[in-house]
Design a protein with these regions (language model features):
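Membrane translocator/pore-forming domains, dominated by Gram-negative outer-membrane beta-barrels
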Residues: 2-22, 26-29, 80-263
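Outer-membrane beta-barrel biogenesis signature
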Residues: 15-84
Length: 263
C-alpha cells in the first residue's frame, strides 16, 4: 500500500474518535432543545431516525417514505414508569471523501437511546446509551477499518440564581477498531481500542421582555480519547505507541423566541 493510504487510515481513525464524541454531545443537546420547545406537552417522548445516503435526492425520498415513519415509532413509550420519557436519535450515512489524494468510502450508523424525567418546569435529569458502527475503506487496495463504539452519558438541566440555568452532561465510551492494511501481496491486520471521556456545560440566561425572550448562552464541549498501543500481524508490520487526543470547543449563542400579532 502507498504511504498516503497509511496516513489516510491514521487520519480517519482520529477523525472517527472526534466524531463519536461530537455525535454523543449533539444528540443530548438536541434532546434538551426539544424539551425546551415543548414544555407544555405532557408526553415528551420523541423518535428521530435519519438516513443520509450522501445524495440529497435519495435522502429526500427516504424521509417521505413509510419506512421512515415506521423507524420513528417506538413500542416502548407507553410502558415507561410515570414521569419518564423515552427518546432516540439515529443516523445512517454513506459518504466519500477525497483528502491528500486518498479516497475514503465511509459507511456509518449511530443510534442514541435516552430516558429522562422532568422534575419540575426547570429541572430535568436523564441518561442515554449510544452504539455505532463504521466501515471505512481507504484507497483502492483494501486498506480500511471496521469500528464499533459504545458509550453511556448522564445529563441534567437545573436552575441557578438570577433566572440562570445550566445544562451539563458527562459520558464514557469505548471504540473497538479492527484494522486491515494491504501492502502489495501482504495483508496485515490488528486490533486497537480507544477509551473516551467527554462532557459539555452550557450556561443560559433567559431575558423576557413583552412577548419576546432572548437567551444568551455560553457552551464548552470537551473530550479525551486514549488510544491503546497497536501492532499489526504479518510481514513488514507497523507498530504504533499509545496516543492521546484532546478536543475542546467553546461557543457563544443567542436564541430568540417571540410571538407577534400582525393586523
Amino acid at each position: 500500500t502507498s504511504d498516503s493510504d497509511v496516513v489516510g487510515s491514521i487520519k480517519t481513525s482520529t477523525k472517527l474518535s472526534k466524531n463519536v464524541i461530537t455525535h454523543s454531545i449533539n444528540s443530548i443537546s438536541n434532546r434538551l432543545n426539544f424539551i425546551k420547545n415543548n414544555r407544555s406537552n405532557k408526553n415528551l417522548s420523541n423518535q428521530n431516525i435519519n438516513l443520509d445516503f450522501g445524495n440529497p435526492i435519495f435522502t429526500s425520498m427516504y424521509d417521505a417514505s413509510s419506512i421512515s415513519k415506521k423507524l420513528n415509532q417506538s413500542p416502548l413509550k407507553n410502558k415507561l414508569p410515570e414521569g419518564w420519557s423515552m427518546w432516540n436519535e439515529g443516523t445512517i450515512s454513506l459518504s466519500k471523501i477525497l483528502d491528500d489524494s486518498t479516497k475514503k468510502d465511509i459507511f456509518s450508523n449511530n443510534l442514541t437511546i435516552g430516558f429522562d424525567k422532568k422534575i419540575n418546569e426547570n429541572e430535568i435529569k436523564g441518561f442515554a446509551f449510544q452504539v455505532g458502527y463504521s466501515d471505512i475503506e481507504v484507497g483502492k487496495n483494501g486498506t480500511g477499518s471496521d469500528s464499533l463504539n459504545y458509550n453511556f452519558s448522564i445529563y441534567r438541566t437545573r436552575p441557578l440564581e438570577n433566572n440562570n440555568y445550566i445544562e451539563s452532561l458527562f459520558g464514557i465510551g469505548l471504540i473497538k477498531n479492527d484494522l486491515t492494511r494491504v501492502d502489495g501481496s501482504n495483508v496485515l491486520s490488528g486490533n486497537r481500542n480507544d477509551k473516551q471521556l467527554f462532557g459539555s456545560v452550557n450556561l443560559n440566561k433567559p431575558v423576557k421582555k413583552n412577548n419576546f425572550t432572548l437567551t444568551p448562552s455560553a457552551k464548552i464541549d470537551f473530550g479525551y480519547t486514549f488510544l491503546d498501543s497497536f501492532s499489526e500481524e504479518g510481514t513488514n508490520a507497523l507498530r504504533f505507541p499509545s496516543q492521546e487526543i484532546e478536543t475542546g470547543i467553546a461557543s457563544l449563542g443567542l436564541k430568540f423566541d417571540g410571538l407577534s400579532n400582525f393586523n
